[in-house]
């Protein structure tokens, strides 16, 4: 293995940037080339079909079978003109990834040959095996039927010569088995509730749209180095490995010059994104070595989420062309920053108003204050649920460390917004809702630099849910996660709160109160009642943890127990009121969450035990034997005053023996703890046992392996080290 390590290190060092074929056209000319967008619909559908489809999309109405047949014919022709040979329903099962089954367009022609066919029935509905996906007990092998159905609001696309049709995925009995179905329900709920409140300010509002702009962080590792690390291959993270002498302490990687191999990968990925209609815009080095970020222009939430899932698949494919492996795990390396996926979330109306943007008039500002107060109330009431929506076995390694938001949900507003709220609560005058515009700041002694415009809020990187000027940044989501999980909880909670708010305001108006006064008083009431969630300080501090507990916020840090928030009465009732989940769906999803947590730790424990006993212990034993031989030879030559020359080697031998003893002992304990946990049938209790008994053993095993790495001869160490994984680019 040590020979393999040096071979792959040499191979990785010899890599050069792979040339990228840059299109001769501008990005705007090939953007969406492989997407059945409205421009392509207009080209391949007759006018009546096009108008009917666009109307159905804009008004969220189902397609008739006759219309579906006409759309399918045009879509098939477009797909085949662009090289597609197969089609697939593309959906998001409860695995955090995507699923697809490819079928050819061919059908018998009755003459011994085939013809290309694609009907509306095949476009609109398919029947995947529901029992083979995570389902929380809703489906069994003997009752396996499930349905996928076309989501017309997300355009079809072509990838690898396959027409992919975004779909929902439900069971034969109607329960959702995916992320898209409840996401669409939550978005419809916030649309309806938000529009009802927005019409207080503009009676022309018909819809409120949820927007999402994600920021995808990731690591790149050379393919050869990756293949020589079984833990990376099997679990997505390093289960052992001592920090390199240099990691991120010089702060020289963030926004640094992008390495040539990486820049070629980024360029290739960006071109592929644009062809698939993903508006990739920003790329840069992140904080940790070999860590990077890609961010797009924001989009409607459902489409943005589809694009993020598509991007993660694309990254793996493009990285392979550049001899990289993409690591989307939240914490692939200890001792350096992990990876997240900030979700920039906002609401806007179909008339063009952005509801989280402070306005220039009292009316606009009252609207802003109204929606701000409702978000604040929703986040406080459901802070435990929002934390559960981003919790996972992988994100557990990242949250709460001084690199990511704490495992306590709070809301940052900034000094100016806080000052306005404080003034509102101290006055009865409603025209006091005023926000200063961006102020000019001139740099001293640098006359050639133009005046800078300073935003009305600072940035608090320690806040998990921060207001950033015209949107909220939900920073706690993990890099490998499906954004839908967080967006479902957030949009549903806000929708439920807006509905309550409207009922309260309408009651005041019915009692004779002026509309503006009724709105303001209800908003002020929400600010008063939900102060506990507002925190602009250092979320990393121990003082905040104590203060958060005093405020009654959810401070649970154990992921299996965090999941309990989904089944609390206030969560269950909220999801039922908004029509997002039924009781059965919630219980099934939590079963899946606990089961996935257990399985991921189970795999990690098995891999760690194997590497410890079959890779590390043999190498440490061989090195220890070399030291023993050396000690015997020293003693055979030197005696008397020189007999102590072997003491350092003897001490090293003792330390190695101790580390090996603890490793073997803890691996045995870990195996037994796993066996005991596996006997438990209740998924929640099993997950808790893995967290409480298996995970601590893994931490001890890793600690002692990392100590051995510093002691064993570098020439003998079998696995690529952190300095090689993180600094060979």
Question: What is the role of each PLM region?
Answer:
Residues 523-729:
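C-terminal amphipathic alpha-helical interaction region
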Residues 1-24, 141-157:
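N-terminal hydrophobic targeting/anchoring segments and the immediately downstream early-domain regions
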Residues 12-120, 124-140:
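Histidine/acidic residue-rich metal-binding segments in metalloenzymes
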Residues 96-112, 131, 229, 236-238, ...:
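Short linear, low-complexity motifs centered on an aromatic residue
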Residues 67-71, 91-93, 121-122, 169, ...:
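Active-site-proximal loop/turn and secondary-structure-junction residues that shape catalytic pockets
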Residues 308, 330-331, 357-361, 485-494, ...:
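Composition- and surface-driven signal marking solvent-exposed, interaction-prone regions
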Residues 67, 91, 119, 296-298, ...:
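Active-site proximal loops enriched in glycine and acidic residues that flank catalytic Cys/His/Asp
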Residues 143-328, 337-340, 347-591:
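Glycine-rich, acidic/polar active-site loops that bind/position phosphate-bearing ligands
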């Amino acid at each position: 293995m040590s020979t393999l390590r040096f071979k792959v290190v040499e191979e990785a060092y010899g890599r050069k940037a792979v040339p990228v074929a840059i299109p001769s056209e501008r990005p705007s000319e090939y953007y969406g080339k492989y997407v059945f967008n409205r421009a392509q619909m207009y080209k391949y559908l007759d006018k009546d079909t096009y108008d009917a489809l666009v109307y159905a999309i804009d008004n969220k109405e189902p397609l008739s079978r006759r219309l579906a047949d006409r759309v399918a014919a045009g879509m098939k022709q477009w797909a085949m003109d662009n090289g597609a040979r197969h089609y697939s329903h593309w959906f998001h099962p409860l695995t955090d990834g995507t699923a697809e089954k490819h079928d050819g367009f061919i059908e018998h022609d009755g003459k011994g040959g085939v013809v290309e066919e694609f009907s509306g029935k095949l476009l609109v509905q398919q029947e995947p095996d529901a029992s083979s996906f995570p389902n929380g007990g809703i489906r069994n092998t003997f009752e396996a039927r499930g349905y996928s159905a076309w989501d017309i609001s997300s355009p079809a696309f072509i990838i690898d010569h396959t027409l992919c049709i975004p779909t929902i995925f439900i069971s034969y009995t109607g329960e959702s088995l995916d992320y898209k179905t409840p996401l669409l329900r939550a978005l419809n709920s916030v649309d309806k509730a938000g529009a009802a409140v927005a019409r207080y300010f503009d009676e022309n509002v018909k819809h409120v749209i949820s927007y999402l702009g994600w920021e995808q962080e990731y690591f790149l590792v050379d393919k050869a180095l990756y293949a020589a690390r079984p833990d990376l291959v099997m679990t997505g993270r390093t289960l052992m490995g001592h920090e390199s002498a240099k990691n991120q302490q010089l702060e020289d990687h963030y926004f640094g010059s992008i390495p040539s191999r990486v820049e070629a990968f980024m360029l290739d990925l960006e071109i592929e994104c644009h062809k698939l209609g993903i508006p990739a815009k920003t790329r840069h080095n992140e904080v940790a070595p070999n860590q990077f970020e890609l961010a797009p222009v924001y989009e409607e939430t459902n489409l943005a989420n589809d694009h993020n899932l598509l991007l993660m698949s694309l990254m793996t494919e493009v990285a392979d062309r550049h001899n990289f492996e993409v690591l989307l795990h939240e914490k692939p390396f200890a001792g350096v920053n992990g990876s997240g996926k900030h979700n920039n979330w906002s609401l806007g109306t179909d008339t063009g108003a952005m509801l989280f943007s402070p306005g220039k008039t009292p009316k606009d500002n009252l609207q802003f204050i109204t929606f701000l107060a409702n978000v604040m109330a929703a986040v406080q009431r459901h802070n435990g649920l929002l934390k559960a929506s981003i919790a996972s076995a992988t994100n557990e390694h990242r949250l709460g460390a001084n690199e990511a938001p704490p495992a306590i949900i709070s809301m940052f507003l900034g000094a100016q917004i806080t000052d306005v709220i404080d003034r509102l609560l101290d006055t009865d005058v409603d025209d006091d809702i005023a926000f200063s515009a961006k102020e000019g700041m001139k740099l001293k002694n640098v006359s050639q630099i133009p005046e800078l415009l300073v935003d009305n809020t600072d940035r608090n990187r320690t806040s998990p849910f921060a207001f950033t000027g015209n949107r909220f940044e939900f920073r706690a989501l993990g890099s490998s996660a499906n954004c839908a999980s967080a967006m479902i909880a957030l949009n549903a909670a806000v929708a439920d709160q807006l509905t309550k708010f409207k009922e309260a305001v309408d009651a005041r108006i019915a009692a004779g109160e002026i509309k503006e006064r009724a709105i303001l008083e209800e908003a002020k009431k929400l600010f008063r009642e939900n102060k506990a969630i507002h925190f602009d300080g250092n979320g990393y501090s121990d003082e905040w943890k104590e203060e958060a507990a005093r405020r009654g916020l959810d401070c649970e840090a154990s992921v299996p127990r965090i999941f309990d928030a989904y089944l609390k009465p206030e969560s269950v009732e909220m999801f039922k009121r908004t029509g997002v989940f039924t009781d059965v769906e919630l219980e099934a999803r939590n079963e899946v969450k606990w089961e996935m947590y257990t399985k991921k730790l189970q795999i990690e424990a098995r891999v760690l035990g194997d590497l410890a006993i079959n890779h590390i212990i043999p190498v440490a034993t061989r090195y220890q034997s070399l030291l023993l031989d050396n000690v015997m030879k020293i003693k055979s030559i030197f005696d008397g005053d020189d007999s102590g020359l072997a003491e350092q080697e003897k001490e090293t031998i003792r330390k190695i023996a101790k580390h090996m003893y603890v490793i073997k002992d803890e691996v045995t304990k870990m195996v037994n703890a796993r066996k005991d946990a596996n006997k438990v049938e209740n998924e929640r209790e099993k997950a808790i046992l893995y967290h409480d008994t298996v995970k601590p053993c893994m931490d001890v095993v890793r600690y002692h392996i990392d100590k051995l790495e510093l002691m064993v001869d570098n020439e003998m160490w079998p696995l690529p080290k952190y300095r090689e994984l993180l600094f060979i680019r």
